[in-house]
A protein has these predicted regions:
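Residues lining hydrophobic/aromatic ligand-binding pockets adjacent to catalytic sites
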Residues: 1-177
Length: 177
């Protein structure tokens, strides 16, 4: 498949969420939450969600290596990703240079090339979520990415302005001059 979707569950009713996936032809979910559970929205707990999606013919896979909320990554020069002023995004961009991230991305790339896949997290708005950086990584590998916002609204992803795709297909986000 040439297109990968991203979607945030946002605590929506599960039927609405499944409808979003079906409307976009999604057959597989890649859950990129570091902790795949929710006290406020138990319908999005890993096992419950897996069961619900299976009932609609949608596969589920948790990819913890792509989860957000990362700490500092040693040995990454601070200027490599200085474009990101938000500490969470900066740390995640640093983390994207690790073997652990590369391993998770390889799983996602394999899945996405086999079946229509959506990268899922909790945050509804892609620009406030680490899915935006995962979208950049997918773009670096030549895939198209579409952010699903609602039944009537989706947006094609574009590489973050200022992002640099390096020869090994990793990314850097240097500060703008």
């Amino acid at each position: 498949m040439d297109t990968v979707y991203t979607v945030g569950h946002g605590g929506r009713p599960i039927g609405e969420f499944v409808g979003l996936l079906q409307e976009n032809g999604v057959r597989s979910i890649a859950d990129v939450r570091k902790l795949p559970g929710s006290n406020r929205h138990p319908q999005y707990n890993r096992d419950t969600l897996r069961q619900t999606l299976a009932g609609h013919g949608i596969a589920y896979r948790h990819i913890p290596e792509l989860g957000g909320l990362r700490g500092s990554t040693p040995d990454i020069p601070p200027q490599r990703n200085a474009l990101w002023r938000n500490r969470s995004f900066h740390r995640y961009a640093d983390y994207m240079s690790t073997a652990q991230f590369a391993s998770g991305l390889a799983v996602l790339l394999h899945t996405a090339r086999q079946t229509p896949t959506a990268v899922m997290c909790a945050e509804t708005l892609w620009w406030r979520c680490h899915r935006r950086l995962i979208a950049d990584a997918l773009t670096a590998y030549g895939l198209s990415v579409v952010h699903i916002l609602s039944l009537r609204r989706s947006e094609p992803a574009a590489l973050t302005p200022g992002a640099v795709i390096l020869p090994d297909r990793t990314l850097a986000y240097p500060a703008r001059a």
